[in-house]
């Protein structure tokens, strides 16, 4: 399924959520059909929980903003220039549709805190491996068996400069505690309302837990309202 087809399906199914929360809603669309249905249990919130739409292109932003939903963006493997570009798309979309006032923006990227260069390199390498595999999935050119991608060789990973550990260190929120704090502050200064950590990587579960504990203990208090 290409991105356009996937996007059309998303545009049809997401609006049904709010109607299912209201209850007794039937749907006869192009892609989805179901009889009168109700979401049980119903949400505690009056109009249901907030809906966040992952968006990168202007059309997806407009879909979210015109429905008064929030927007989550990610620069993927890219850095601050891409983050700024995405925030500008969000801001321009909000200006285009000023009547829709209840919009928040969230920025998602990979993050890792190291106590020294060895630990930082470890985090950057793990994220590098993640994006090499991420990119291979989207190329759709490797064999998949039992839901697992045919493994990349180390040579293939080493030859992909775009996803190198050096690029990950530069473009992702990976570094010392102070560097990570400074980066989150930079995202805040751009106008993002929320920051989200993309924790999926090739780090072990214990390394992820240790990092998350550091972030909760040492970074989040710097941004408490």
Regions found by a protein language model. Name each.
Residues 4-39, 81-192:
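An alpha-helical appendage that flanks or caps ligand/catalytic pockets
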Residues 60, 80-81, 113-116, 202-206:
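Flexible loop/turn segments at secondary-structure boundaries
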Residues 1-4, 209:
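Glycine-rich tight-turn/loop motif centered on a GG-T
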Residues 43-84:
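Loop-centered beta-sheet repeat module
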């Amino acid at each position: 399924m290409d991105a356009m087809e996937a996007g059309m399906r998303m545009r049809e199914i997401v609006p049904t959520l709010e109607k299912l929360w209201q209850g007794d809603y039937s749907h006869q669309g192009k892609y989805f059909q179901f009889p009168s249905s109700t979401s049980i249990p119903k949400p505690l919130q009056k109009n249901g929980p907030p809906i966040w739409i992952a968006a990168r292109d202007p059309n997806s932003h407009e879909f979210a903003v015109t429905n008064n939903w929030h927007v989550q963006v990610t620069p993927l493997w890219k850095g601050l220039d891409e983050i700024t570009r995405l925030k500008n798309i969000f801001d321009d979309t909000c200006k285009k549709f000023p009547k829709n006032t209840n919009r928040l923006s969230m920025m998602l990227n990979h993050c890792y805190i190291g106590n020294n260069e060895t630990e930082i390199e470890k985090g950057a390498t793990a994220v590098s491996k993640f994006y090499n595999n991420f990119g291979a999935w989207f190329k759709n050119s490797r064999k998949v068996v039992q839901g697992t991608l045919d493994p990349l060789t180390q040579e293939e990973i080493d030859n992909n400069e775009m996803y190198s550990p050096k690029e990950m260190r530069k473009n992702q929120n990976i570094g010392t505690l102070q560097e990570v704090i400074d980066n989150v502050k930079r995202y805040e200064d751009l106008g993002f309302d929320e920051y989200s950590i993309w924790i999926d990587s090739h780090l072990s579960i214990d390394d992820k837990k240790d990092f998350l504990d550091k972030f909760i203990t040492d970074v989040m208090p710097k941004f408490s309202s």
